């Protein structure tokens, strides 16, 4: 088995190669909004470094959002392309599942990612050992976020939420890697071809022409 994992849901992109014995290699970089010109090149370079031929790839996993509109679109396009070319399954991994993963089976946690315009993607995870892709995220106004025992989001979003959440225990997100995408995908029950994105928010609109 050779699994390719792709994460382009934020400004930090990453790709990983996973084999029968675990992680083979992974790379991450600050891509900004340049996902389309960098991700496939980085994957090709990683495969060459590990002497892996594209035809030997047997499974693909990709972060399907919510997150960066352009990044998600690029990552899913590459994943679907690999799946079609090799006639292999592709597994979608929810980006909020990645944030909640460190607390899986330990205690309940609410996780969020900013969607802009005063709204966020919000999901509540139970203390049980939940299964990937079973917790639904909601597009929620920031002012409507309920209190939670433990909350995980980036520091910029927490700065907006802290005044209304009071004594909620805040956890910054742990460093999410493309290897985590692979790990979650291997525990996921369903494969999809093609993968559909989870956007929730509105796309960023270009400025009007002067």
Predicted features along the sequence, with ranges:
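Short glycine/serine- and small hydrophobic-enriched flexible loop segments
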Residues: 44-45, 84, 183-184
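Oxyanion-binding and handling regions
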Residues: 1-22, 34, 91-210
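Residues at secondary-structure transition points
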Residues: 30-38, 69, 73, 77, ...
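N-terminal beta-alpha supersecondary unit
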Residues: 1-64
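DPxDG-like acidic metal-binding loop motif
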Residues: 59-90
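Short amphipathic alpha-helical face segments that pack within enzyme cores
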Residues: 38-41, 77, 81, 98, ...
């Amino acid at each position: 088995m050779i699994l390719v994992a792709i994460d382009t849901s934020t400004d930090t992109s990453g790709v990983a190669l996973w084999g029968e014995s675990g992680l083979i290699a992974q790379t991450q970089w600050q891509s900004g909004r340049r996902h389309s010109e960098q991700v496939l090149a980085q994957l090709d370079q990683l495969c060459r470094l590990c002497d892996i031929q594209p035809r030997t790839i047997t499974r693909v996993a990709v972060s399907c959002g919510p997150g960066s509109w352009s990044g998600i679109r690029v990552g899913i396009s590459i994943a679907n392309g690999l799946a079609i070319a090799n006639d292999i399954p592709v597994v979608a991994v929810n980006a909020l599942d990645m944030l909640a993963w460190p607390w899986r089976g330990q205690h309940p946690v609410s996780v969020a990612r900013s969607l802009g315009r005063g709204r966020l993607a919000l999901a509540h995870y139970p203390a049980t050992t939940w299964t990937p892709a079973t917790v639904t995220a909601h597009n929620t106004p920031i002012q409507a976020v309920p209190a939670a025992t433990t909350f995980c989001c980036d520091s910029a979003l927490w700065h907006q939420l802290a005044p209304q959440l009071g004594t909620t225990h805040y956890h910054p997100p742990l460093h999410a890697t493309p290897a985590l995408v692979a790990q979650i995908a291997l525990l996921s029950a369903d494969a999809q071809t093609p993968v559909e994105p989870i956007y929730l928010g509105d796309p960023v609109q270009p400025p009007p022409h002067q």
